[in-house]
Amino acid sequence: MSWQAYVDDHLMCDIEGHEGHRLTAAAIVGHDGSVWAQSATFPQFKPEEMNGIMTDFNEPGHLAPTGLHLGGTKYMVIQGEAGAVIRGKKGSGGITIKKTGQALVFGIYEEPVTPGQCNMVVERLGDYLLEQGL
């Protein structure tokens, strides 16, 4: 399966039990910041934004004072899982980032999608990739 198929079929799909509700944007990005696959709506990010995200995975709490920035959008960092998941909130939407052995799985959402639904979609794919050694 291509990386684009993972984004299209496993991240940008309808939320289980909520037909028509889906993430706003999604991507799979290597630890080095190279985009493996992304939705057409995924924001163009700066290398320093990706560096900040990677630093927060290695040093949990790094982004808390400044917020998480992606594509020029600032998210307030909320409770995640140290070294494994970063979550951010902005207005009625937010972001979930799951770290795997080689990649970061991104999901961005707006209402009516809930934070929990975004977490479920992103973390399920991230956990699968981890099980596959990726």
Curated annotation (Swiss-Prot):
PROSITE patterns: PROFILIN
Subcellular localization(s) per the UniProt record: Cytoplasm, Cytoskeleton
Bridged cysteine pairs (disulfide): 13-118
GO CC annotation, single: cytoskeleton
Quaternary context: Occurs in many kinds of cells as a complex with monomeric actin in a 1:1 ratio.
Extra remark: The variability of the residues taking part of IgE-binding epitopes might be responsible of the difference in cross-reactivity among olive pollen cultivars, and between distantly related pollen species, leading to a variable range of allergy reactions among atopic patients.
Role according to the record: Binds to actin and affects the structure of the cytoskeleton. At high concentrations, profilin prevents the polymerization of actin, whereas it enhances it at low concentrations. By binding to PIP2, it inhibits the formation of IP3 and DG.
Name under which the protein is recorded: Profilin-2
Organism field: Olea europaea (Common olive)
